[in-house]
Amino acid sequence: MINRVDIRAVEKDLLKTPKPIVIKFQKWIYDIEQFGLEEVRKVRGWHDHTLKGNRAGQRAIYLNKQWRAVYVIEGTEIKIVKVIEVHPHAY
């Protein structure tokens, strides 16, 4: 069961991230540690999905409509790659 999350790569970014987003991110980490990744993926509210293109092999969750946490699975651990703000595409 995958239930460990490594956030070392994004610790500095989280200091600049809005507090409600950080709280939601911490809730996701808590859920992973308590229930494991497979169970948390079943929760539709996180919108856990695979990424395509230059982020192929990575997964993401929605923290809200504008913010995502991007992660990869390495062995029995989740490594957070980035917590990013998504901007609407210009048409």
Language model segments and positions:
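Enriched for short, Lys/Arg-rich terminal
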Residues: K12-K16, P20-I23, R59-Y91
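Sequence-level motif detector for i,i+2 pairs with an aromatic at +2
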Residues: M1-I2, W46, I78
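Generic structural motif
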Residues: R4-V5, D48, A69
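Arg/Lys-rich, positively charged N-terminal/basic patches that mediate binding to nucleic acids
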Residues: M1-E33
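A short, surface-exposed loop/turn module that caps and links secondary-structure elements
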Residues: Q34-I61
